[in-house]
Amino acid sequence: MTFADRLPRRLMLLGSGELGKEFAIAAQRLGNTVIAVDRYAHAPAMQVADASAVISMLDGEALEAVVQEFQPDLIIPEIEAIRTEKLQEFEDRGLTVIPTARATHFTMNRDRIRDLAAQQLGLRTARYAYASCFEELQTVAAAIGYPNVIKPVMSSSGKGQSIIQQPDQLQAAWDYAIAGSRGDSQKVILEEFIPFELEITLLTIRQWQGPTLFCPPIGHRQERGDYQESWQPAPLRPDLLAQAQAIAAQVTEALGGAGLFGVEFFVTPDEVIFSELSPRPHDTGMVTLISQNLNEFELHLRAVLGLPIPAIELLGPSASRVILAEDSGDRPSYAGVAAALQEPWVDLRLFGKPDMRPQRRMGVALARDESVEAARAKADRAASQVTIQPS
């Protein structure tokens, strides 16, 4: 399948955050029409899109109406909060969902993707179990042991995740997970805590025609289950990199379709352990905006349209550092931008979100240098210069 025989194409983004904004810009550079859909007005991708719509994407009827109105060539999910059953219905009617409706459904439900990896494909993952009530959580926690990690089966951006050291923390973790769940889900996954040396994202590109491709591995650090900084290339032994690539190829092949996938791993001294997967550009991959000849958004676009990807080249050691809001309010303004940009090989992305709240990601600093350590320090300096205030 290819959509590159005739451009432009009409691309509908379901989710219009900062990742969708960068994808929309990449799509428009090749003349495509972008329709940005999200649950709130003035979302980042809406600011650059050709058209937009504000709906609840958990509402199947609202999804039907917006697809009927705009008649997209491709439907491209960008977030988790979508009625994925409706995507399958669209696909059954001949519409193209990226990468596939099945892949979107599996990866937006942690139980589906974990069972696919561990049970169907036989891949090494953390030991895990599910719980649908607090009493069941107590039982599986005792079986798997402590420390452990509790996550909602359906959530995004680290919402509802906790690391549990002892049984008296379970009730608070259960309450936090249910509060962070998407939709009406009352199910959590509890998994053993892996004492990893490094967490990495392997950006994996499936093409309609052609081999599966990989970007150099990206290391990242998280707090509260959400990414704070990433760097590329991550230090990884050749044998462990080969393991990660083989696992990523196997999982993405099982999901099918075309596009860029963010495949996450825990790295220990002896192995890489599959963690999670996103069937779209990944937040830790924003570092590729400065690190690669083709960033993750351009790679995703080329893959879904069936355009060639002759080479993926690392331009130099690079890093990203998030810029977080500290306060709440509307119409945020940014100070310190000039100071942040005073060093060479530094760039910023300020997302243009219409409101702010504590710990909300409002921008990212990007840096390149002679080493990963220097790039990380430079990105951190740049991010620290930027302050955000409500108008």
Curated annotation (Swiss-Prot):
Pathway: Purine metabolism; IMP biosynthesis via de novo pathway; N(2)-formyl-N(1)-(5-phospho-D-ribosyl)glycinamide from N(1)-(5-phospho-D-ribosyl)glycinamide (formate route): step 1/1. GO terms for biological process: 'de novo' IMP biosynthetic process. Belongs to the PurK/PurT family. Keywords: ATP-binding, Ligase, Magnesium, Metal-binding, Nucleotide-binding, Purine biosynthesis. PROSITE patterns: ATP_GRASP (PS50975). GO terms for molecular function: ATP binding; magnesium ion binding; phosphoribosylglycinamide formyltransferase 2 activity; phosphoribosylglycinamide formyltransferase activity. This is Formate-dependent phosphoribosylglycinamide formyltransferase. Mg(2+) binds at E264, E276. It catalyses: N(1)-(5-phospho-beta-D-ribosyl)glycinamide + formate + ATP = N(2)-formyl-N(1)-(5-phospho-beta-D-ribosyl)glycinamide + ADP + phosphate + H(+). Involved in the de novo purine biosynthesis. Catalyzes the transfer of formate to 5-phospho-ribosyl-glycinamide (GAR), producing 5-phospho-ribosyl-N-formylglycinamide (FGAR). Formate is provided by PurU via hydrolysis of 10-formyl-tetrahydrofolate. It is an enzyme of class 6 (ligase). Its EC number is 6.3.1.21. ATP binds at R110, K151, S156, S157, G158, K159, G160, Q161, E191, E192, F193, I194, E199. GO terms for cellular component: cytosol. Residues 115-305 form the ATP-grasp domain. N(1)-(5-phospho-beta-D-ribosyl)glycinamide binds at E18, L19, E78, D283, K353, R360, R361. Homodimer. Pfam families: ATP-grasp, PurT_C, RS_preATP-grasp-like. Transmembrane segments: none annotated. InterPro entries: ATP-grasp, ATP-grasp_carboxylate-amine, ATP_grasp_subdomain_1, PreATP-grasp_dom_sf, PurT, PurT/PurK_preATP-grasp, PurT_C, Rudment_hybrid_motif.
